[in-house]
Each structure stands twice: as C-alpha cells, then as structure tokens.
C-alpha cells in the first residue's frame, strides 16, 4: 500500500495544487527539499527532466529515501556512476523506470523467448515511433529522442536477450515532423 504524502513541483500552480488535493495529496510544494527533510517519507518518485535526475537521486539517497527515477539517470556517465554509487553507499533501493519490462505485451514476448517457443535469439530488431513529437523545451533538457526514448529499446534488447551481452548496435533516425527538433541538436 502506498500513500502519496507530498508532491514537489517547481512549476506548481493553483490548478495543479487543486487537482492534487482532490486526489488526496496532503502536501504540495515547489521545493523538493521539503520531501527530503520529511522523516515520514520512505521513498521518492523522481519524474523531473533528465538534466535533474542524478542530482535528485544523490540528494534523495543521502536523505535515506528509496528511489524510483524515470530514465535515464543522466547523459553523463560519470554522474550516472556517482548516483548509483551514492544509492549503494546509502543502502537505499534505486529503480530506474524501464516500464516496458512490465508491459504485458513485452512480457509476453520475453516469456516466449525464455521458454524457447520462438527459438534461439540471434538478432533483435526494434522499430520505435512516438505518437507525437515532444515539446521543443523538453527536447532541450531531455537529451533528445535517443537518450529519452530509445533507451527503452536498448533495455528491451538486453532484457529479451536473457542475459546475453549485446555485441553490436546499429541505430538510425531522422527528423520528419518538427524541424526545431533537429535544430536543437536531436537526431
């Protein structure tokens, strides 16, 4: 059983606050520090932009909070390693939001692979498309489509391979809808 006690959002507005209170959230704040200092809170869900993930993971781990964080942890491998190490050193659980592993359709494919029903995996080919382009403001802080969304495909490839290490990755992409995405340096 989970109780959401506090939601922190630096962009909190009256409408969002009203909605959260209607959902039973006791506290709303613009400052994440309020959550980290609350000893009654055991775990945090970090669903901010990618450029803040490692910072919040480190702060939450140091505050003794278990962590579920949206992917990816960071675009900088050094910061990723620091965040993971900080969580390990603090003895808190850290889970990254690779939600496709828990989707029943993807899980069905995994189960068929593991049972041998569809044979031995030799190659995995994944095609992905988002239903709509992200807002350009998000593209600028998310790391772009490869960091933000294609990471799911890489995770699924490793998951479906059942422990076998990936030996080669080929990726291609292009901007077909909103030229501003390409101008922001994505794809």
Task: Briefly describe each language-model feature range.
Residues 1-23:
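N-terminal Rossmann-like dinucleotide-binding module
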Residues 2-6, 25, 42-44, 144:
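Short active-site oxyanion
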Residues 3-4, 40-43, 66, 92-93, ...:
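Structural signature of beta-strand start/N-cap positions in the alpha/beta core
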Residues 5, 134-187:
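Rossmann-like dinucleotide-binding domain that binds NAD(P)(H)
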Residues 9, 123-126, 168-171:
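Hydrophobic/anchoring residues in structured secondary elements
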Residues 23-86:
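Beta-loop-alpha module in the N-terminal Rossmann-like domain of NAD(P)-dependent dehydrogenases
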Residues 29, 68, 93-95, 125, ...:
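Structural detector of well-ordered beta-strand residues that form the stable sheet scaffold
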Residues 51, 74-135:
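A contiguous active-site-proximal alpha/beta segment in oxidoreductase catalytic domains
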């Amino acid at each position: 059983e989970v109780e959401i006690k506090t939601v922190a959002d630096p962009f909190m507005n009256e409408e969002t606050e009203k909605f959260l209170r209607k959902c039973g959230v006791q506290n709303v704040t613009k400052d994440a520090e309020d959550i980290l200092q609350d000893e009654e809170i055991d775990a945090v869900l970090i669903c901010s932009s990618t450029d803040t993930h490692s910072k919040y993971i480190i702060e939450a781990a140091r505050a003794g909070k278990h962590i579920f964080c949206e992917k990816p942890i960071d675009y900088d491998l050094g910061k990723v390693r620091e965040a993971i190490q900080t969580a390990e050193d603090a003895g808190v659980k850290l889970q990254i939001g690779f939600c496709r592993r828990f989707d029943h359709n993807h899980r069905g494919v995994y189960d068929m692979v593991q049972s041998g029903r569809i044979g031995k995996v030799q190659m995995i080919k994944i095609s992905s498309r988002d239903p709509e382009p992200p807002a350009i403001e998000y593209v600028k802080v998310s790391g772009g489509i490869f960091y933000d969304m294609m990471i799911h495909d890489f995770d699924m490839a490793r998951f479906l391979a059942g422990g076998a290490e990936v030996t080669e990755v080929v990726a291609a992409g292009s901007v077909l809808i909103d030229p501003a995405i390409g101008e922001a340096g994505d794809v």
